[in-house]
Amino acid sequence: MQTGNEHGARAGAGQDAPLRLSLALSRVSQPDDPYAFQFAAQTYLVRAGDSGLAAAEWTWDQELLSDLETLRLRPWEIEPPQRVGERLRRFLAGTGWALEEHKLLEAVHRRQPVILTVSSTAAELYALPWELVSHRATGQHIGELPDVVLRYEWPDTQTIRERPVERGRILLAWSAAGGAVPAADHIAAIAGACSATQYPFDRDRDVLAHVSCESLVAALHEADARRSPISVLHLLCHGAAVGPTFGLALSSNSPDETVTVVDGPRLRQLLAPFASTLQLVVISACDGGNIGALGNQLGSVAQALHRAGLRSVLASRFPLSITGARKLAQELYGALLLRHETLEAAVVSVRDRLARSARQLDWLALQLSARAADGDVTRPLFVRPFRGLQPFRPEYRWAFFGRDVEIAELHAQILGLIDRREPRFVVVAGATGVGKTSLIQAGLVPALRAEPSPRWRTLELRPGASPIAEFTAAVAGLT
């Protein structure tokens, strides 16, 4: 076990730092070849936390493949999750997992967040949903426990060094080439969360309809050229089979075809040049995290991006229901923007929301690819809440605290002047640096804009040597 040394996963919740657990796996036979899979019983080496290596045997048989396919296509069947969970528990029983499990359960009991990193040099083990590891006594899966998140890491990879961008943009790119998608719902979810926090999101600029490989790269290049790069890429489309694995059904620029199925290596080639600013890729598509046929060397779309150095990729290892995709967008951006949660905590929030559906396994489909070396406090939407000597402006209303009384007084004074038909002139005076500008810009202005009837327009000007002339010119611009 490694102890986290950063802040707790839920920002502002006052919780302890997350408990960091790890599960590292490798194949005994041909350990240097990730794809040397054999459809038979195989021996693997398991290291749980700081425990020593222990050998464990896993049997790949038709019953297991049938259960995995049932999880993917018939999520309403109730026995396969328990069978797979029990298999995973028995596989780990003779290793150091018992101690890690004990630590995990103690952390859950005291409501401490837990982050379990699963890594494997054997590619086939990523086909297993480790969230289903069950507890012998309770039968509960570790993935259903409160405040527990799993992240999947490919060993010996590194995240491309981040180029920090304050208030980096969100780009929603969607394609209906593979069938209709609920684009309007996803746009509304992102736009609503951004609007509530004054986070920049322009439906004309930040929504890329009928996305193709060419238009996606062009949009990313244009954002970089304008010095407003994309921090979060939200891809909404259908998944589709491609060779032995799965890809994304994007629109085609070719007159001879309407659909281009983009596999992981191809998407990796497109997005890798932007890895220093792309902090999160959300793949809202069926099988975006599905590695496909066991032993194939392509892997999943999410895994390809992760291995190339992108910091965080959130995808679905199974088909994602339309309702589940909608809930994912609503909860994810609500958590990141409205509640200012870390990505790790936001994934827990999304999973909990998805788990409320009795006939779907969307909660189990959700898969986060990230590296333990990057820490436990991932914030893909970087917002600096402290302005230093700079004043708080309206877009920073969410981070402006401690002036509620003064804001209410100013608001009441202005409304009182209007009601009494008196000159509508209010002076705010004070010593330099006490926050006069912030009080107006991040306090009063948002309060006026929040009124039910949108009757207010605001102007900002400097009086200069001729204040009347400056004021007259500014007001003239309103007509």
Regions inferred by a protein language model and the residue ranges of each:
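Charged, amphipathic alpha-helical interface modules that flank catalytic cores or transmembrane segments
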Residues: 6, 18-45, 347-352, 360-404, ...
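Non-catalytic, solvent-exposed interaction/assembly segments
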Residues: 1-138, 145, 164
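Short boundary motifs at domain starts and secondary-structure transition points
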Residues: 11, 103-110, 155-167, 380-381, ...
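Amphipathic helix/helix-loop-helix segment enriched in hydrophobic residues with interspersed Lys/Arg
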Residues: 55-58, 344, 348, 374-479
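A domain-level signal for caspase-like cysteine endopeptidase catalytic cores
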Residues: 121, 157-258, 283, 296
